[in-house]
């Protein structure tokens, strides 16, 4: 099996070097372009956060904090760059928390994972994650499309129809919860 991309064949030293370069830039971008991370990260010298060890010195953002911030500043609580009109989707996950979503360029970053499973352009993947309100269905569909496979957006439930569809269309992989 070939690698998803060259990131997978980096040496340990190259991974650490890449992280040291990218991590502070990403944190500075979050601080400089989002209201909430500006508040959370304002007292830290983010240029010195260049490793996993130094990242652990920053405060953890908890789901309950996101939910509370979103009540005060709907829909995303000041955690995103831009407004809701910058995104193709808005999802609601338990909490509730609202999450933005896109469908292009492996936005959810699951392509590498799907590729590691051996799924590729000759596969038909039956996506049994829900497409209703939560992001799981779209997240996995996006990853499957990234590796060139075909998606059957089955969602959840209706086990007899699920089994028939898998047989009728030649499904080669199933992802999701197999509790129908």
Where do the language-model regions lie?
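Nucleotide 5′-phosphate-binding alpha/beta core
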Residues: 1-116, 120-122
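AMP-binding/adenylate-forming
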Residues: 99-112, 126-180
């Amino acid at each position: 099996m070939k690698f998803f991309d060259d990131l997978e064949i980096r040496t340990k030293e190259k991974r650490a070097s890449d992280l040291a370069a990218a991590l502070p830039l990403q944190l500075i971008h979050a601080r400089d372009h989002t209201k909430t991370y500006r508040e959370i990260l304002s007292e830290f010298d983010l240029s010195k956060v260049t490793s996993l060890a130094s990242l652990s010195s920053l405060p953890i953002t908890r789901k309950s904090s996101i939910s509370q911030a979103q009540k005060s500043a709907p829909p995303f609580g000041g955690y995103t760059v831009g407004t809701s009109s910058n995104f193709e989707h808005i999802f609601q996950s338990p909490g509730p928390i609202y999450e933005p979503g896109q469908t292009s360029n492996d936005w959810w970053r699951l392509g590498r994972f799907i590729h590691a499973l051996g799924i590729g352009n000759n596969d038909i993947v039956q996506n049994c994650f829900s497409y209703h309100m939560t992001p799981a269905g779209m997240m996995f569909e996006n990853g499957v499309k990234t590796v060139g496979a075909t998606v059957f957006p089955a969602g959840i439930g209706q086990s007899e129809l699920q089994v028939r569809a898998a047989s009728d269309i030649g499904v080669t992989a199933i992802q999701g919860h197999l509790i129908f």
